[in-house]
Amino acid sequence: MSYLGVGVSPGNVPVYHGMNLKVIDRRVRLAELVLRCVICALGVLAAVLVGTDTQVKEIFSIQKKARFTDMKALVFLVVANGIAAAYSLVQGVRCVVGMVKGSVLFSKPLAWVIFSGDQMMAYLTLSAVAAAVQSASFAKLGQPDLQWMKICNMYGKFCNQVGEGIASALLVSVSMVVLSCISSFSLFRLYGGNKGKDGARW
């Protein structure tokens, strides 16, 4: 008996057919490859936008230059997105090689490594975006209680470019969360397949 391409054993344990498993794996890998390419491109874009952002302003005959290194949260954002882009590039190459060879991922240790790496990257990018958004809000709105000025009133171009970089980084973090869900599916379906085989034996 089958339902939606999934076989059901006498013990009512779903068992994926071999051919359907390959089709599912191909679609999952294609989605994974697209997301990794998006993360790589947007990660580089976010790092470049924030890392190259500068603006010089003359205040009381003194020139002051705003750069991303003035805010530690922006430095963290640049580093985190650079790491995420490099990681996604490596994993993207792995996806391409796997798709060319037509192999199906059955290695549990490798699946665990990919799952753990994606989880770490998701947490890293999310924390970087959260820290950058908080710092950017202080720069935009100021903090009257602490007598912090609205920096963006003086460095408008700098703040606008930082905002674009944070928006790109936000898309990276969201894509990374989706990708971690895909890698968790790829991992735990291996255990589901084993359970199905055990159920079929009974």
Swiss-Prot record:
Source species, domain of life: Eukaryota
GO CC entries: plasma membrane
A Pfam family assignment: CASP_dom
Keyword Oxidoreductase recorded: no
Extracellular face residues: 51-72, 140-164
Keyword field contains Endoplasmic reticulum: no
Mode of membrane association: Multi-pass membrane protein
Keywords from the named record: Cell membrane, Membrane, Transmembrane, Transmembrane helix
Compartment(s) of residence: Cell membrane
Segments traversing the membrane: 30-50, 73-93, 119-139, 165-185
Cytoplasmic compartment segments: 1-29, 94-118, 186-202
Family: Belongs to the Casparian strip membrane proteins (CASP) family.
Subunit structure: Homodimer and heterodimers.
PANTHER family, per database record: CASP-LIKE PROTEIN 2B1, CASP-LIKE PROTEIN 4A4
NCBIfam families: A_tha_TIGR01569
Name under which the protein is recorded: CASP-like protein 2B2
Species name: Populus trichocarpa
Lineage: Eukaryota, Viridiplantae, Streptophyta, Embryophyta, Tracheophyta
